[in-house]
């Protein structure tokens, strides 16, 4: 009877955690569909690129959703007084941990497939479609040829990960270093697991670079843009009218030189062509501004202006909360960690930060911690999007044709993709979701940086022996008191989350993340200063001479 009751309790705990995960999965799919449809170009919409973007972003978010499930399951193995629950014997605990680990295996394998095969293939397929009117078969062959390079990179990462030495320095004999070795060896020595962990950690490292560039800047730009608002449509239209008149005068001046029938010099012809292109752009902008000025949406957003200011102030406080927590966590690692050779593992909490204290408290009232982690992930996505929309997607583009004589590189340049609501091309949409996928992968480590104890052990406690001296009695009395689990806890008393072990199997990645966090803080400060110095944004998205994805008939989507 007792065994059956214990098994029933264990099943109930698993059902609760996985039911919440299932509901979150449905919410993620709905969010990704709405988000991608919001940004994709209506004129150049492609079914395959849309599905690819939705699927890849959803897989990354679902992987992040496993983090609170992992923490929930290890936390519910123990009571608040530090004792294990009746059903949480060694076999059941291992079964629960393996369930989460197999979930990570599956999702991370799908992510590798998306990043190194499917997304590049779809991207190159549409690049070939844009360049010439070749047949479908030729487009597929060329796309597969270019995708082969990404497959080779993935294979190299898997091979390096499978055989890279993980041995820690042997000149460390302290108890702490024995604990470090235990943490790195906890997942086992499977070559397949090491290969997958190394590949995902490499992608997470790329996600860290993307977060430093886009998320750190977006965390400062988003709230300040909300507070400052946009320029007046009427004032912008007046300025635009003055620019039109000035350009028309220049055109008339140049044309007047050829009234007597003499041909214009080459220099004047080039100038005339530039002024005519500029005039077309200004007139297109005039139509957009006129539409916006008379739009009911502009008036509605104007009425919501005080609410936007409040949201901007709120987001500034949220950004400061993250920055302070990250700074204190990194400072704690700098002062009290086991050093760079361990990946800056912390033994015990020396400097508390707000989020590290808040999350374990919220976990006692399920599912408040789940909600907070979801909010943190979504906040990172929206701030990343703010950074991407302000900076754009620059990338170095090298294309080659495989010939019998070898590889002939025929195109090498920098290219910028613009991200705008309802105007994003299929290739740009794929790049956008690729960057967001990498940033979301890095979010798991970012949450660990913000709340290291919570991500490692959740709300687990363990017993420690404390010597108590009582008045009126001789000698000391030993008393067992519960203490929050940390890296200094006995190995058999606290269960480490699979998330932590998977992302920290290679100490050198953890060391790189540590230095990346300092760079993140630095870019945030620089971005905050730059955002403060910049003026208000235009009421419409920028209209350029080469703006091929803006039709003359449709107004540009405007920012309010």
Language model features: what each stretch is:
Residues 2-238, 291-400, 404, 416-560:
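Extended, helix-rich structural scaffolds rather than catalytic motifs
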Residues 42, 262-272, 297-300:
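Short, surface-exposed loop/turn segments at secondary-structure junctions
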Residues 234, 241-244, 248-251, 255, ...:
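Alpha-helical coiled-coil heptad-repeat register
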